[in-house]
Amino acid sequence: LVETKDFNIGSEGDIFLVDNAKLSGSNRLGNSFNIKANKINQIDNKLPIISGDKITGDINISSKIHIQIKAKIAEINTKSNVLKLFGGFQIINEKYKLIGKEIFFDFKKNTITSDQPLTFLFSKGEIQGGKLQIINSENKENDLLFLINDGVKIKYLL
């Protein structure tokens, strides 16, 4: 779903540009997102990939897990259900903050991955690493399982 007050379609009907857009979506697994973008348009004048800049929004990974996102640029592939945040991003939760260059939300597989360096900040310290995979934990009380590797550095306050 896209909401906007300013929608421009090319003369051939094959391109579009939306200013001050709100995008939202959900799937059968309970994932949902609400994103605000300064501008959105399709990539290479083809759907299903939509690009946006100056992104802010909320993502519900499950009924218990809610995060806020900020990014310079986002791409949403509506066919594969993948959201890519890049050009600098922040993911914020009441327990942690994740900062990096690029990250992928795969709503079909219910995973979050990054192959770029990132910093994971929490109340007692920080973890820096080169790769990240976040998956839903089998133990529902633990929320998410963070797998960080490739040059991990940990700072922890006792």
Which role fits each region the language model picked out?
Residues L1-L158:
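Mature-chain termini and adjacent capping regions
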